């Protein structure tokens, strides 16, 4: 009937071809006083339409929806979610039951986790829309991070991904401006960013999802104010802050850069553990303790390579300051060299000085005491340091008088801070961390002085 009458209607005649070609149609209303509004904005109309939609399939199984809490027709199969990196190109399911072993109480398919047709359509449509917008999502390892603000402003997700993953300069934002914005938001102050005003009280959501064949798994789903997320990120950045080599131009270390410090870069598989990346992401965003696997991974790489890089030193510092915030750790794990009398820290500094003495006495040497003695000096100082100190005395004799006086003074000052009982027999894991930080600080001070002289 309508197909015969509608084309002849004067208001529809000109647009009928478009309307009849799979176009979307929105109904509106004009009140007697001339006001216009869309039918889709009226709560009563929306509820009536949804009620009709929920009961349109008489054969559909009804149950209480786990999302809306209302009795409605249950989605037997949920729509596919596309755009998750690493998942099937055709899409993957967040909720699916494709074998009897996964079902309970005689239910089939979606009835095992009842979600209404509307809710299934709504969450998959919204998630697909966000995944299609590269300003809202970022991949780190096998985890795809999707974030959004409650007011739907893209500036919030843009800023969060810059804070979290870097890449600010590629989007026309300087590192200094980004750091200033993060600091202001972490202190609860609104800032202007990307032609928008960021409100620290704005509700913000972060979802982490990972692919597994035809399914998706939720690594985390976090909700907080944008300002609280900013504070957690600022605290993380402050804990990571440490003196860096002159060649390292990075202002901040991204999550991926931190995870890479746990990987053997000479191995075939250079990807960090997906579980580690997910746990690290959650710890940073929530302000919670860092995962023990992060410390274990870094410690293993230091032992294997006998190298304390900026990233590894930053991880050690951040880990102990967050997970064990004692006054002693706050004294030892600082940004740059400090005069702490903590024995493991002093031993790390001493080892660096002994290595320098050897290098100055033997220019062009291919291997230093670090290659042979670092691990034993770090774990069992009493077995390594007596030999190293004796060796240093021989190296001092090869030097010119100014160098000999300079390094002898350094040795004397550091040795004076050690206990009268001598070198410790062994160091615990936290003490080994202090040793490695002391070694890193002293070594960076030496390199900084060398660069100034050049």
What are these regions (language model features)?
Residues 68:
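Short Cys/His-rich metal-coordination motifs, predominantly Zn2+-binding knuckles/fingers
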Residues 57-63:
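Short metal-coordination and nucleic-acid-contact micro-motifs, chiefly zinc-binding Cys/His arrays
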Residues 1-51, 55-56, 72-454:
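Extended alpha-helical scaffolding segments
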